[in-house]
Amino acid sequence: MLSPKKTRFRKQHRGRMKGKACRGNKICFGKYALQALEPAWITSRQIEAGRRAMSRNVRRGGQIWIRIFPDKPVTVRPTETRMGSGKGSPEYWVAVIKPGKILYEMGGVAENIARKAISLAASKMPIRTQFILLEESHN
């Protein structure tokens, strides 16, 4: 499971997910990618489930890059606790995803294999996503 080794503060505000992703919205490493179409919090467990689904499908061939990292702690209060008495303790980590953000990239495999593997990863995600290809620029 992905999580930061060390953070400056233990707890964070929830924040808002306004607008589109202006960074991390282009393919950088591979040839194929999975792009988010909706804003959401994606947990480290969901990221890991998607990675496992992809790597099991392609077996030894190809290479996978995870373009997101869960760096936001989510706090949960104990059950049957009255209101007040402070914020809950950090339970799990999430990555804040805006529309347009690249979640996974893939390379070194045929397009049909990449499409199948990325669709398996997409089924593990809590949001609508799309499969995108790297456009080769023709000079």
Curated annotation (Swiss-Prot):
Q: Which PROSITE patterns match?
A: RIBOSOMAL_L16_1 (PS00586), RIBOSOMAL_L16_2 (PS00701)
List where in the cell it is found.
Plastid, Chloroplast
Q: Which SUPFAM superfamilies does the record match to this protein? A: Ribosomal protein L16p/L10e (SSF54686)
Lipid biosynthesis keyword on record: no
> Main subcellular localization, coarse class?
plastid
Leader sequence range is none
MF term (GO), any = structural constituent of ribosome
One Gene Ontology cellular component: chloroplast
List GO BP terms, alphabetically.
Answer: mitochondrial translation
Query: Which UniProt keywords are given for this protein, alphabetically ordered?
Result: Chloroplast, Plastid, Ribonucleoprotein, Ribosomal protein
The record's section on Gene3D superfamilies has: Ribosomal protein L10e/L16 (3.90.1170.10)
In terms of domain of life, where is this protein from? Eukaryota
Hey, which family's this protein in? Belongs to the universal ribosomal protein uL16 family.
Q: How does it assemble?
A: Part of the 50S ribosomal subunit.
UniProt-listed HAMAP family:
Ribosomal_uL16
Q: What is this protein's record name? A: Large ribosomal subunit protein uL16c
**Gene transcribed to yield this protein:** rpl16
